[in-house]
Amino acid sequence: RMRSNKAMINRRNLSGFVHALKAGEAVWFAPDQDYGSKGSVFAPFFSVKKAATTNGTYALSKLAGAPLITLSMIRRSDKKGYHMYISNPLSGYPGEGKVAAAAYMNKIIEREILRAPEQYLWMHRRFKTRPEGEVSLYK
């Protein structure tokens, strides 16, 4: 990973992300991962009404004030490279509050997945964190 990146920032180092953004650096992280209940809210994601969704995107937007874009790579049908999709800066984000921001971001992620759903990493346990008292979706 380091070969093509300037640096790696630990996902728990929010101030490192904010500092890099305020210095004009581009940062990337995966908001579609389940990072656990701490630092997450529950928002709809496809047909799952309560998917743990990171507050990291919301926090970075509020603290750094940097524009957000999406970047998706879709494997070419000839398997010789990728098509890269880079969005315009997202408008209307973060909206009002963490849950609204998470729902907005999940809709964006859904849109990107639907470009080529067969290429999404469905095997990762995106829904492992559940609201207290709710049963696992993997049993």
Stretch-by-stretch model annotation:
Residues 11-139:
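Non-catalytic C-terminal accessory region of glycerolipid acyltransferases
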